[in-house]
């Protein structure tokens, strides 16, 4: 049985100020664009698009654009600093297991995305055109020269490698809004000699803007709070934005379902109310899950968004999985594991936006409403 009702969120002001920021800035046909702060570096004013703390919700055009006055400066090693930075990675292929290994070694000379002149970079790694397997490095805070040394494996038959392209996209992590792309690199695998381990360092290119090609599903904002004394986790679904259009009229009737899992075992499930004809629903509905202290690091929560259909089965839009990084579940992003970790150390609600993801192929199933 679905649990019904919603518990009023508290404290309300703190959460609303995060998920529902006051829009201040320049009005445009698409809404409001923030007024970026400027830093004078002697050759002109460079806009610094900061989102910590956030006062507006960023648009797709709000990317950091480094200024090049025609003379690229030198790094400490004497190498030219590229305007989007550089990335160092390693590629090798295991012919016996048909596995492609990609090691993200480091990045350097990345653009500064935060007010303090630093960034919180991480790298997404995937292979085109399928995008079935996506990996992320850990987030390294307050640096423009992160070192990762993290390896990811893709199952690809050797005779298919020539038709694949390796994509590396560097992001700046932001807890209170959508993460910003800093730079990207596409590597056609047909150009790689897989007879040896290939060590590559290349400049990053200008990142592509989010568009229909990226099949964005939308974003969701929720808060989490853990009370060890009572063994309860309170999850408050605040709102969602820019959801995928599921209905003929170009809208959706979204609602949110929350599943509590221990491994593959379903322990509890709850859902929000439905919101009709909107791609930006507001909920502010809270749910409590009873979790014993010895189980808190063994369970995970799946927050999924669905489109309600009266005449047919409901359609899945997207989901995020929240849990400890020690579970080693590939669907738990670094943003989700960081929110979980902060929830475990803070006694206040932890609020964060997340980008909705596709379900992994083996986990796809129909709605059971």
Curated annotation (Swiss-Prot):
Pfam families in alphabetical order: C2
Coiled-coil residue windows: none
Residues annotated to bind Ca(2+) 5: 247, 307, 309, 315
Origin superkingdom: Eukaryota
Manner of cofactor binding, per the entry note: Binds 3 Ca(2+) ions per C2 domain.
Effect of residue 253 to N: Defecation defect
Consequence of gene disruption: Defecation abnormalities.
This protein's UniProt keywords: Calcium, Cytoplasmic vesicle, Exocytosis, Metal-binding, Repeat
List of residues binding Ca(2+) 6: 309, 312-313, 315
Localization terms from the record: Cytoplasmic vesicle
All copies of domain C2, residue ranges: 83-204, 216-354
Stated name of the protein: Synaptotagmin 2
InterPro entries cross-referenced by the UniProt entry: C2_dom, C2_domain_sf, Synaptotagmin
Expression tissues: Expressed throughout the intestine and in several neurons in the head and tail.
BP terms from Gene Ontology: calcium-dependent activation of synaptic vesicle fusion; regulation of calcium ion-dependent exocytosis; regulation of synaptic vesicle exocytosis; vesicle-mediated transport
Gene of this entry: snt-2
Annotated family: Belongs to the synaptotagmin family.
Sequence positions that bind Ca(2+) 2: 114, 172, 174, 180
